[in-house]
UniProtKB/Swiss-Prot annotation:
HAMAP family referenced in this protein's UniProt entry, alphabetically: Ribosomal_eS1_euk
Function text: Component of the ribosome, a large ribonucleoprotein complex responsible for the synthesis of proteins in the cell. The small ribosomal subunit (SSU) binds messenger RNAs (mRNAs) and translates the encoded message by selecting cognate aminoacyl-transfer RNA (tRNA) molecules. The large subunit (LSU) contains the ribosomal catalytic site termed the peptidyl transferase center (PTC), which catalyzes the formation of peptide bonds, thereby polymerizing the amino acids delivered by tRNAs into a polypeptide chain.
An example Gene Ontology molecular-function term: structural constituent of ribosome
Keyword Acetylation applies: yes
Cellular localisation: Cytoplasm
Subunit structure: Component of the small ribosomal subunit (SSU). Mature N.crassa ribosomes consist of a small (40S) and a large (60S) subunit. The 40S small subunit contains 1 molecule of ribosomal RNA (18S rRNA) and at least 32 different proteins. The large 60S subunit contains 3 rRNA molecules (26S, 5.8S and 5S rRNA) and at least 42 different proteins.
Name of this protein: Small ribosomal subunit protein eS1
Gene Ontology biological process: translation
Region (Disordered): 1-22
PROSITE patterns for the chain: RIBOSOMAL_S3AE
Amino acid sequence: MAVGKNKRLSKGKKGLKKKTQDPFARKDWYGIKAPAPFNVRDVGKTLVNRTTGLKNANDALKGRIFEVSLADLQKDEDHSFRKVKLRVDEIQGKNCLTNFHGLDFTSDKLRSLVRKWQTLIEANITVKTTDDYLLRLFAIAFTKRRPNQVKKTTYAASSQIRAIRRKMTEIIQREASSCTLTQLTSKLIPEVIGREIEKATQGIYPLQNVHIRKVKLLKQPKFDLGALMSLHGESGSDEAGQKVEREFKETVLESV
């Protein structure tokens, strides 16, 4: 008779569960910091696997894109239909320093703008900021009734649509190409460009609901750490040295 192991005896008890490991035990929380143009700087937190061996947590975080409501960034519910994209460019301690990556409208807002008896006019243009960011801006506008108009519809003629679109692209080109990305973001928040278009096209056809509905980042320049730090108010210029005023009395020798 062959002597060997009894397979039935070596088996463990049926129904024993494997020891489950908490997946969050190997992860860390990092804070997300918004750049200067926004009022609220602490956006939220994000999870990442801890640095182990050749896998660095910082490398996993860099390049992450977060979509945040502009209402949360500005503490203003009037901006709730706009979403801002923020991109992680640098890690400092347990904080992710982000930069502006794009802007978009919520789909429900866009659908609510489209109505009967009016003309929808759209324009898009690719512009380059003074700090070499290549962006594509999409504008949207709708015709409205003139004062004391009896006619129900507000349809614009093809020649008027072309003239309005030309004016839209001119204004966007002028406003976007003459400033940095940060300055452009400051213009996009209060919708300065939309108001400029509305004012400039009054002579062609009165417009309403004029918005920059989308901003797409196509190309960015070489990463500049100093520029990013200045956006987050951590450029280190305050630590360089400050003039200290002290009470100092010049001693005068009475006798030589």
